A protein has these predicted regions:
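Charged, low-complexity intrinsically disordered terminal segments
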Residues: 1-209
Length: 209
């Protein structure tokens, strides 16, 4: 937020006084690494964190995201993980906040489902969480949606956890959330020639989302 604020205002503010004093930092297990992502450079930090976590998975990948409007690299990484035997589960909303983005999200389901990725829609309402949990070892929570705007155009931030006690807390939260979801089947997606063409057109619109 401060990076965006300074950019819009033309300032160069000193951020160090916002950071806690060393004496205020409590002992903790594992690692907690905050990160930021900005469109002001060519480094897509948010996407790099996600792809790195996917590549390290050997047992499971749990993802919660309000939007699933992904690029080829992320789609390929998730499909390859599922094909390699990793339990890949993605939670998205069943009740959308934006109907057109919801349709584009669903257009991304078929290739993932066919590769073995399991997709769940949260039925009680809209879900806005953005997190990854991998193998009880890694987790990230932040503002980074799985869509083009968030990954490539917006100012975002998050925190990466490794071998930290909160990783399993997040895992348990995802598993509890899965109990409130309906699992999506291939038969729930657009079928036939018209449906396939419609999904292809919607995926072409992904960079605008």
């Amino acid at each position: 937020f401060l990076t965006m604020w300074d950019h819009c205002c033309g300032w160069e503010e000193e951020f160090r006084h916002f950071r806690p004093e060393p004496s205020a930092v409590r002992p903790w297990t594992g690692y907690v690494q905050p990160y930021t992502d900005t469109p002001l450079n060519r480094e897509t930090v948010g996407q790099s964190v996600y792809l790195n976590m996917i590549s390290k998975a050997r047992k499971y990948i749990y993802i919660t995201t309000p939007y699933l409007v992904i690029d080829v690299a992320t789609n390929t990484a998730l499909c390859n993980a599922a094909k390699a035997g990793v339990d890949v589960r993605i939670i998205t909303p069943h009740i959308p906040d934006k109907r057109y983005v919801f349709e584009v999200t669903r257009a991304h389901y078929p290739p993932l489902l066919e590769a073995g990725v399991r997709i769940y829609e949260y039925t009680p309402g809209f879900i806005h969480a953005k997190n990854f949990v991998v193998d009880d070892r890694f987790a990230t929570v932040g503002t980074v949606n799985l869509d083009y705007r968030s990954l490539f155009l917006h100012f975002e931030c998050g925190v990466l956890l490794q071998n930290n006690s909160q990783v399993t807390v997040l895992r348990d939260d995802v598993r509890d959330t899965l109990l409130k979801c309906r699992e999506v089947q291939v038969s729930d997606c657009h079928t036939g020639l018209l449906g396939t063409v419609l999904d292809s057109v919607l995926r072409l619109l992904s960079p605008l989302m």
